[in-house]
């Protein structure tokens, strides 16, 4: 039977002076995330903004937190350094509820980019509000290197040899680790945290990069397949 994987929504908020559909609150999914999950024959369900998260956690086999808007600094006890970095508190609250519900149901959770930051904040961690060297308009073409932590889960998946290339676009980054989290990878050469994993029961793992954007033709690139397979295997093993 195909696995049923929930994906948290990106939110588009109505803009002043907008017309038509842009006057509405929109829940949406970046299709590359769906394609990545569909490549392993999983069924993909975007979870709309709602108050029934426990029911979704009961019915679905796992959760992926997709990328998108900043985490509001208010979520980790800080004020935004700039007004435009206020983030999306509505989405923050909803995704924290999702992480809590799926974790309580012992369902695996995988965070991508913003999802890694959200998991860290949900567990009491903090963020660097601005990391300009990791922010770029190149979007899914921006590549930098990461080094996997020796002995980590990712090192067991991929081996520990040398820096590996990933697609990573963000201007926030994990600062202080949340509860029961360990570092799985760091950016090279600046050492920012790029991947985390829970040391507690169940599967809770997150990467700051975008595995769904990986280029299979890049010989030095980190193949997204093993990470996806590990997550889906955790969903099957429940």
Where are these regions (language model features)?
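N-terminal beta1-alpha1 cap of cysteine-dependent amidohydrolase-like domains
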Residues: 1-108, 121, 128, 132-158, ...
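Gly/Ala-rich beta-loop-alpha elbow adjacent to hydrolase catalytic centers
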Residues: 111, 115, 120, 124
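Active-site-proximal beta-strand elements of phosphoester/diester hydrolases
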Residues: 205-208
């Amino acid at each position: 039977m195909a696995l049923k994987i929930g994906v948290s929504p990106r939110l588009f908020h109505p803009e002043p002076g907008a017309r038509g559909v842009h006057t509405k609150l929109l829940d949406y999914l970046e299709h590359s995330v769906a394609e990545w999950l569909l490549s392993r024959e999983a069924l993909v369900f975007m979870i709309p903004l709602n108050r029934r998260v426990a029911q979704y956690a009961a019915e679905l086999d796992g959760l992926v937190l997709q990328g998108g808007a900043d985490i509001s600094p208010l979520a980790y006890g800080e004020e935004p350094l700039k007004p435009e970095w206020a983030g999306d508190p509505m989405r923050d609250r909803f995704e924290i509820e999702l992480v809590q519900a799926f974790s309580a149901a012992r369902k695996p959770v995988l965070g991508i980019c913003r999802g890694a930051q959200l998991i860290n904040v949900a567990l009491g961690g903090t963020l660097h509000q601005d990391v300009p060297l990791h922010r770029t308009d190149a979007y899914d073409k921006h590549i930098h290197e990461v080094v996997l932590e020796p002995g980590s889960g990712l090192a067991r998946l991929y081996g520990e040899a040398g820096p590996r290339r990933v697609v990573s676009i963000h201007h926030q980054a994990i600062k202080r680790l949340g509860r029961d989290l360990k570092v799985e990878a760091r950016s090279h050469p600046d050492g920012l945290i790029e991947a985390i994993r829970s040391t507690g029961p169940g599967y809770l793992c997150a990467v700051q990069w975008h595995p769904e954007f990986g280029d299979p033709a890049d010989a030095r690139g980190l193949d997204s397949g093993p990470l996806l397979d590990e997550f889906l295997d955790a969903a099957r093993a429940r």
